[in-house]
């Protein structure tokens, strides 16, 4: 999780606006431990009041090998029931649509013309080049994965001019499966 307060978040959001950023996304997670529908609704309303161009909302997923996973396995996390999570999602749809946002993907909402181009590149199986440690790229039907540590990254760059630790050429079947799988996230589906 992120270690900051709501007031710090608002301060940074306003600073970004002051510096000229005119297309801001805010990521939110619902279904947090001990969270209820009223708290989620209030959080969402406060974000809507800021009027970011894009809002992403995700249901909390407990990943293995994380502190939450250990707490969950020890029975020390009071997570909302599935029905409450569904209510939170429905509330999200209701509030964001009423506020003028349109849903173009399962978790993503934007003002008109402000869809996240970065995400659409993935979901439409278009080429993208990523740089730096741990980065993944997809170009010309080939997937590339860079070294995770800066030491290995620099070593590989010096030795061979790239930092790839994995190169996978997608088959036509791979591309079709990925296009369908990723396209299913979009409200428009696949075409």
Go through the PLM ranges and name each one.
Residues 1-191:
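C-terminal scaffold of the Radical SAM
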